[in-house]
């Protein structure tokens, strides 16, 4: 009898260790859900009268890409990366939706420098729809839960390789998908005229003439990426600053040479 009790005591810890780690699986589910929730929250307010669902498709692809990126890192680094990326994306979504509710337009990142001028409109926030505020609270809650339940464990290369493959596949779809939509441009009135071309999806995506039109083509995440990449918005590294300074000196030297009086040979 006593021997059986000892055996049960020895096997109990092993049984506990063998139990599924539900916390890990919940964390794995919450990370892509949180990233997609940012796009879904934006879509509710930014879809406009067209009601296009393309932003949700792109949001799903970007949720896969970003989840693969953070889950492919060691647990500690991945958790920090998730918190930073998700936090910035959520703030971007809140600012863009808030601006759109007020002005029916979206902003480029370069317009954010004038955000301080909007302090006069703070009182208007009280009149914003309740579901906008509830959506913000939901984003905060999802972010906190995902950080808290972020999967922990030993780092292994298989995880990174799988993440790279997943990122590459989703990224390939996100890159090609806008071009699949351009067939709709043939239905635009006066499609061959300059006016028609400016109304086309291709012009919205390639020329970036309007932030909201770009969003309707490719969603919030890809709009943000296109804005950063096309408008060269990135940290001013020492190399960039040095190259910029060299270019400025070259231009100054050119105009200084032009200002010198030229000898008339006649």
Whereabouts are the PLM-identified features?
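Charged, flexible boundary elements
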Residues: 245-254
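Short linear motifs in intrinsically disordered/low-complexity regions
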Residues: 3-5, 22, 260
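Non-catalytic propeptide/linker segments at domain boundaries
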Residues: 237-243
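Membrane-embedded segments
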Residues: 253-256, 260-266
């Amino acid at each position: 009898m006593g021997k059986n009790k000892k055996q049960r005591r020895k096997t109990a810890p092993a049984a506990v260790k063998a139990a599924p780690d539900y916390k890990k699986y919940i964390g794995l589910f919450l990370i892509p859900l949180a990233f997609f929730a940012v796009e879904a929250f934006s879509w509710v307010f930014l879809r406009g009268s067209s009601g296009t669902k393309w932003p949700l498709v792109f949001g799903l692809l970007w949720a896969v890409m970003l989840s693969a990126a953070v889950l492919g890192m060691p647990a500690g680094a991945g958790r920090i990366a998730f918190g930073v990326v998700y936090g910035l994306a959520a703030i971007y979504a809140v600012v863009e939706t808030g601006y759109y509710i007020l002005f029916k337009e979206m902003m480029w990142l370069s317009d954010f420098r004038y955000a301080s001028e909007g302090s006069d409109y703070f009182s208007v926030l009280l009149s914003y729809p309740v579901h906008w505020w509830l959506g913000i609270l939901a984003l905060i809650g999802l972010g906190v839960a995902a950080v808290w339940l972020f999967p922990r464990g030993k780092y292994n290369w298989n995880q990174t390789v799988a993440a790279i493959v997943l990122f590459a596949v989703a990224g390939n779809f996100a890159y090609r998908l806008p071009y699949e939509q351009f067939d709709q441009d043939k239905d635009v009135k006066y499609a061959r005229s300059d006016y028609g071309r400016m109304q086309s999806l291709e012009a919205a995506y390639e020329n970036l003439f309007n932030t909201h039109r770009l969003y309707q083509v490719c969603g919030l995440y890809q709009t943000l990426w296109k804005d950063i990449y096309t408008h060269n918005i990135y940290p001013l590294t020492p190399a960039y600053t040095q190259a910029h300074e060299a270019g400025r000196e070259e231009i100054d030297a050119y105009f200084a040479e032009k200002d010198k009086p030229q000898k008339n040979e006649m």
